[in-house]
Amino acid sequence: MRPSVLVQTSSIVSSALVSSAIGYAIGWPVSKYFDSNTTMRLLLSPVIGLGIFGAVAVSIFHFLPITAINLMLIVLGLSAVAFWLSKGTIDPLLRSPASPGFCWFTVAFLLCLLPAFEIIPQHYGGSVGVGHPIWDHAKIAIVNEIAQNGLPPANPFHSEAGSPNTLIYYYVWHFIAACSSVITGATGWEADIALTGMTALFSTFVVTWLAVARSRSAYAAWWSLPLLFVGSLKPAVRFVFGKWLEKWMAPEHGLQTWIIQAPWVPQHVFSGTLALIAIMAYLRILYSNAGRNMALAVFMGAILASAYGSSMWAGSLSLLLILPLVGALSVSHVLKVKRLLEVLISLSVTVVITLLCAAVLIREQSAILHTRKVVEFWVFPIFAGDYWFLDIPGFWLVLVFLEFGIIYLSFLIWSFARPSDDSKRYAHIDCALTVSVLAPLFCTQILHSVIMYNDLGWRVLIPSMLVMTALTSGLFSTTIGKGTLVGRLTTITAIILLAPSILVGAKSVYSNTFKFQVEGPDSEEGTAFKASPEMWKAVREVTPPNEAVANNPLDLASVTYTPANISWAILSQRRHCGTTLDFLRAYAAQLTPKKASEIYNFFVRAFAGLATEDHLRIMKEKYRCRTLVVTSRDGLWGKPVLDNNSVYKLVSEKKGKWRIYR
């Protein structure tokens, strides 16, 4: 029997090792298509392997139970297929003459622990707190749902009689976390922490591969690490000029750099990283005359499906913009070398494999189109007041510069630098990388999502951000300190912007990783959160994993920066029949905004102490709340209706703390 602790380090480590093993087992043979350098293939393999595994296994496990034996058989089977399709000599997309050494791998691993640290519990006195990103990791409930009940996942955030209650969300990344949970016995929270850290590391690997391979300089690997940890320049501008910025800029939420996105939304970072791999595979299919593209087309199809299945924005919408443009730019070359039929056949194979792997996800997610509008056109508001004609240039000249500072300015320097003979040899790659930067940024400017917040705007540009970081790393490694115009501009950019950008990123890491441990405060809710595993263990003992519980949507709301019942989401390992409003809007997307508000208000009123026996009956019969969990913090605690009703009976309690009814 596991002790009632929040997370165990051994489970996190074992989950990380399982994810890495899956990635390398499947991705290692496929990496031959991208680079001939063995060390560089170590950088590419895990993302490729996890991408292929995620898409294929999600489809398979809609028909098979998710067990450790089945998972190992699927991994072995996919690894065998990957080795078979990659056997023999393969002419890679790039042949890197340099690669990072062991010291770089060690430093990269240690730095990429930081995003994982932002979602682990932090102790101060008798209390436990969590960093701000944990709010977006309420999706740990999805990991637990898949691990316990298989696919397709039921919605762990809402249940209602007469409704299919299917989860409408892109969950391939969470499925991968659930697989490591099944194999190791880790909780959803532990598996989520592990995969968050591994996603950050593998994303860093791919950025570094591109930086080193394109610049042909091992020093680019060292530049990639600080550049991934840069933050927005806005705090630095505020520090120098006070509130001057707020007076003339619109209050719209800005964009986010890698060090913000990696701990908050690892599924989107994973998807954006896969998008970068897919673009490179696409380039080889379009421009390589060496053959073997049919096998690569199969792998690309699975990677595309996994990118889509992990993020509708970073790996789906971004690629819908990038790939057609890159393809259009390649037409003259394809016609010149008379490879049109070969390319069309390869791309047809890619499309077929993508649809086969993504079909179940497309079918599940298409249900949202019947109830909700997903995106709207707009012009990203930059300046205060209704000056859209100024907002258009302001987006590129002001907002993107403030948000992405050093990597955006360096990308512009790289774009206008005089091409060398080496650059001309890779002109098709450079052209594709330029498109990969500009197309997602343009999308952010003219489209925004409306389900909840502007997730589209923040996530669709992840491939753009990764490419800019790689290009900046390469630029710095080859031009800093040189007497040319490009060298001087690059040196000045690094001197002025690097330090403040890293300081802003470091401040974000400190706030989410160490601040609570240093400053506290010690609070009643923090103490209750620390003790909550005992309550949820008792809930699991009386509640099967395929049933839902009713618990106050606002229980321990002060633990997170935005009020939410994070204790249920990350610790209960059970479904909830009506959770926090933000969670209902985001993850029960089949509900209209009005319906989501009605459900949320119903549960809030009930736990505030206004519940009658009829309310309790509606809970149990309409919303399928088989278990009712009441704590001493709830207004419902001690109300006579709990002792005198025909709906729920007391089955477990800890005197003065909590009671469980069935």
UniProtKB/Swiss-Prot annotation:
Protein name: Uncharacterized protein y4nK
A GO cellular-component term linked to this record: plasma membrane
Protein species of origin: Sinorhizobium fredii (strain NBRC 101917 / NGR234)
Keywords: Cell membrane, Membrane, Plasmid, Transmembrane, Transmembrane helix
Superkingdom, natural source: Bacteria
Membrane topology field: Multi-pass membrane protein
Bilayer-spanning residue ranges: 10-30, 46-66, 68-88, 101-121, 167-187, 193-213, 217-237, 263-283, 285-305, 312-332, 342-362, 373-393, 394-414, 432-452, 460-480, 485-505
Subcellular location per the Swiss-Prot or TrEMBL entry: Cell membrane
